[in-house]
A protein has these predicted regions:
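Alpha4 helix (beta4-alpha4-beta5 surface) of REC/receiver domains from two-component response regulators
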Residues: 62-78
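CheY-like receiver
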Residues: 102-141, 147
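Catalytic-site or vestigial catalytic-site microsegments of nucleotide-handling domains
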Residues: 133-162, 184
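Short beta-strand->loop micro-motif that forms the acidic, two-metal-ion catalytic signature
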Residues: 181-192
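Conserved small/polar residues in nucleotide/adenosyl-binding loops
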Residues: 195-196
Length: 197
């Protein structure tokens, strides 16, 4: 369409959007590592460009947790389009925000939002004491919803497989997913995951 413009990446899109007023901006989310930089870009645009701009995030692979989505929305995104939405649904969702004004409050300081929604900065194998301390801190964080702090899973390997061997099969790619070994079990903590997920 003559009304659409495609950009090479989110950074180029962000720089172009900094001069727009009531444009519709659709960021692309490819991987979990993009969440914080994308949140910062969204926060900046919303604070600088105001409520007429429509800011959407199109998730291209399953990489968002509920807290990640809450962060993007709290930073000023109008909507997050899930990775499994077909193109026709995606276009309908983009169309649905046209004419809307963003009405939610966006705090001036993004660090409050980041610390509230992304409190655990660890990933992968942790020593037992570090693991226990991290899980305890998450469970006692009053800023996270009670049902969304995380899920703790203890796995016992099948006979003939040592727990250390099972550990080599775990490759978490999300910050906040940690694991340890204890009591001949592989213990995983998937942070900020809803029980229903």
């Amino acid at each position: 369409s003559e009304h659409w413009q495609l950009f090479n990446n989110n950074e180029v899109l962000f720089n172009e959007a900094r001069t727009a007023q009531a444009a519709t901006v659709v960021f692309s989310l490819q991987q979990n590592a993009q969440i914080e930089p994308l949140a910062r870009s969204i926060h900046t645009l919303r604070r600088q460009r105001g409520s007429a701009m429509k800011i959407l995030v199109r998730e291209n692979t399953a990489s968002l947790r509920a807290t990640d989505e809450r962060l993007l929305l709290a930073c000023g995104a109008n909507m997050v389009i899930p990775w499994n939405a077909p193109l026709s649904r995606c276009l309908t969702m983009i169309e649905s925000v046209q004419g809307q004004k963003f009405s939610r409050y966006v705090p001036e300081d993004i660090t409050t939002l980041l610390s509230m929604t992304q409190p655990l900065k660890l990933r992968g194998f942790q020593k037992w004491d570090v693991f226990c301390n991290a899980v305890n801190n998450m469970m006692n964080n009053p800023l996270l919803p009670a049902h969304g702090k995380g899920v703790l899973v203890a796995l016992r390997p099948v006979p003939g497989i040592r727990v250390e061997q099972a550990l080599t099969l775990c490759r978490p790619n999300r910050t906040g997913d940690i694991m340890t070994i204890g009591g001949n079990r592989l213990v995983l903590f998937l942070s900020c995951l809803l029980y229903t997920s």
